[in-house]
A protein has these predicted regions:
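Conserved SGNH/GDSL esterase-like catalytic core that processes O-acyl groups on lipids
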Residues: 78-155, 175-186
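Short, well-ordered coil/turn elements that cap or connect secondary structure elements
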Residues: 105-107, 163-165, 193-195
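Conserved beta-strand termini and adjacent loop/short-helix elements that scaffold enzyme active sites
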Residues: 113-115, 171, 201-206
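Catalytic His-Asp segment of secreted/periplasmic serine-dependent ester chemistry enzymes
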Residues: 181, 185-233
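Conserved beta-strand segments of alpha/beta enzyme cores
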Residues: 109-111, 167, 197-199
Length: 233
């Protein structure tokens, strides 16, 4: 489960195998997680030798791209509640607001600010207002890009600069308009390449072939998709 899944595998090595999500109102079949094993590799050998749960295996958290300063040792995952104690801050648009209940359940300590029709440049002021109000997280996630085309990488860089070097993720978008989808996802990926502290969580890839995750508009996750979205993070 993103940050949570990486920590869970540390605590329970058997989770390193491809996992099926716990049943929710409708059970999605996730194909990968934002932070799990990119190639299925986990460094479990040393931990298994001592046979002790007190020495969890060391794993490499991954997304499509992982912030180089993400320290998952600070976070704990509770398999019973499928929740993580990471104090994540998330700013997004209607996709974020529509999945916020599922995300909040997965990250009880998270601050989530999602608003319909929010465009990426508007998130600069939103982030500043939220942090000024004390809503600052150790990991920042931006879920933006469904409301208009990102004009240039500088718009993305402004948000990156605001985080002050914190581990930061951008989530790719899924749209029925390839021209917007391709442009915006490319902009996010190019910005991530240039900033070591920035990672990419690939909702576009995660939801590929899963029309059951989406409402009829092809953009917004339904109940099943909301759980899949939160699981991905």
């Amino acid at each position: 489960n993103g940050i949570a899944q990486a920590r869970a595998i540390q605590l329970r090595p058997e989770l390193a195998a491809p996992a099926k999500p716990v049943k929710k109102p409708a059970k999605p079949e996730p194909e990968s997680s934002a932070i799990n094993a990119a190639n299925g590799e986990t460094n479990t050998a040393d931990a298994n030798k001592n046979g002790s749960d007190s020495q969890p295996p060391i794993i490499k958290p991954i997304a499509e791209k992982v912030p180089n300063n993400l320290d998952i040792s600070k976070y704990a995952y509770d398999p019973a509640t499928e929740s993580c104690n990471a104090d994540m801050m998330m700013v997004g648009d209607s996709v974020t607001s529509g999945t916020s209940d599922a995300i909040q359940a997965a990250f009880p300590n998270a601050f989530i600010d999602g608003l319909p029709n929010r465009q990426l440049p508007q998130a600069v002021d939103v982030y500043q207002q939220d942090t000024a109000a004390g809503h600052s997280g150790s990991v920042v996630v931006f879920g933006l890009g469904t409301n208009g085309v990102i004009s240039n990488e500088q718009e993305v860089q402004q948000l990156i600069d605001l985080t002050g070097g914190k581990p930061t993720y951008f989530i790719t978008i899924r749209m029925p308009y390839p021209w917007q989808e391709n442009n915006n996802n490319t902009m996010l990926r190019e910005a991530a390449k240039k900033n070591k502290n920035v990672g990419i969580i690939d909702w576009h890839g995660y939801s590929e072939g899963h029309s059951e995750y989406l409402n009829d508009d092809g953009i917004h996750p339904n109940m099943t998709g909301a759980y899949a979205y939160a699981t991905m993070i």
